């Protein structure tokens, strides 16, 4: 491509290059299963990391994606069991040791020999015992005899004891002084333990054939465990971050190691912790749409050195995107320039790129030039980038850069493999070429494809170093998880969980706060609010009534108003969650509470939902908004239990959990209970006047017809049979329920009491 002959090369509908992948000049065939070579490409020269440790990351990624799929079938017992068994298949005898070795290399610490065998064997032992438990559970499901129930209880007791012995404070997976080192193993074991405890809440009273329900005890053990495990994961993740030198003295190698720790611990620890709360079957009684908002970065491709400076820690960290509202890559402009020498031959290179995002913003990296190639990618999830770089020049020149890049992705409209190619001419006689492949592993193997990819390209950044007759560059790729969707699709058979940072609202009084990988929204001013576009995926969803629940943290009591298409439909008094002397800058799991608006509401086929904070000068953080089909839960007073129970650890818990003080009668403004909003496509003009400070409220790039058509694989392709999941024992007067609700909970028809 000559950039001066075609200044605006637009690629609107990319050609399918599925049969031409080998056109790219690989040193090795890219269609052959990638092992050590591609891992080194993925880590891009980070030699301190043992290539074999990729198997540990693959295990974590594989299990995580099964976990996200699992949240999409909560309520369907057989689907849940099948997914758990699939996840267990990722754990081999050496998985625990591989995870341990990997973190040892990242944080430069070694576990004492006498503790290693206990730690590395714990995960394998738990997985094998869990598999045995599932066998007995399925047998009991098919034939619910007392004898089969006793076998389930025996298997349950065995694995529960294994988990507690491994996860308890100072046990094999939380050894004092080595907590960070053991964290991926800890998170994996915690995940399986919580799934086990979830089964106890739903079924233990039945397989034991108890006449007196123990559901409350089992529920509170589960909730205490969720709190314990999330707190442990976030605390020791932060401890690991604090070990790195992040000063201006730190160099590129230190940043590489820091970034590898942040990325790999996100994939193997923090992502699990984000999903753990959905294992509470009272708060999440059915399929739930879970989306991860965090951004991770593959290792940089460094084309600097020689006569150009290699960026240090600070310059590299400046490339990393600060916390922001959710957005997606819609378009990328790539700019082409030419080197001063050698003369009379093509010598073009990638001089810069500009990323255009779905929220209307754009970011420029490097330099603009007249030569421009434009890729429209709003309907493409790029999951892999193949790059050819060069080093060389004439005489004493030291030019280092990029002249070829192939972006491979999935067309989200038809799920077909798609390739976009940037290529400019540069002579091999004067330059040495190197090939690089950048990606994050797929769901069931190292190499991602259009079916199993787990991450999509969010942004591509580059840092430039310039000297006379010398150029150096560093390329960095940012990725978001596939579970994050462009739209908020309402379904009649699923709880819609919307991360607060998916808001279409903007402004300085709406700050995004990074909270252990995931992003949350901080609201400051008097009428500050957040708005969200909702789209019903079908006519049934447009006629479904939804309960609205929020997860929040606040320094003081406040009042929230719920607004639908410009009309206020409910209000809610919320309690402070942070104790005196605390702050919203380092929020822990226990600092968040759930609160539910009274009533249920029909959203229509398309709508804009707003949450507005009423009381001024009170810092307030919103984490998630959840829309729950009203048929799943006729009452949500259990949410108040969740907020106020005694959160002792599961190892010293008080068996008197059965009594709660649920004096929640003063929590709700009881107006608007029967609001019916059936507005398909029209929004009331008065909506714009509700928040006087709102400007640029709507995202012009919104596509009302998108409706999540591109990625239903995580949550939507399962039978949602929720009729036989719940034990009425949750609600059999074991709580002090002063909420005034005496309604039939609707879960009491199919279980032994």
Curated annotation (Swiss-Prot):
Residues 680-696 have a biased composition (Polar residues). One of its GO terms (biological process) is sporulation resulting in formation of a cellular spore. Transmembrane segments: none annotated. SUPFAM superfamilies: delta-Endotoxin (insectocide), middle domain, delta-Endotoxin (insectocide), N-terminal domain, Galactose-binding domain-like. Coiled coil: none annotated. Keywords: Sporulation, Toxin, Virulence. The keyword Metal-binding does not apply. Residues 680-721 are annotated as: Disordered. Residues 712-721 have a biased composition (Low complexity). GO terms for molecular function: signaling receptor binding; toxin activity. The keyword Flavoprotein does not apply. Has low mosquitocidal activity probably due to rapid proteolysis to inactive 56 kDa and 43 kDa proteins. Belongs to the delta endotoxin family. Toxic segment of the protein is located in the N-terminus. Promotes colloidosmotic lysis by binding to the midgut epithelial cells of mosquitos. Active against Aedes aegypti and Culex quinquefasciatus larvae. This is Pesticidal crystal protein Cry20Aa. It comes from Bacillus thuringiensis subsp. fukuokaensis.
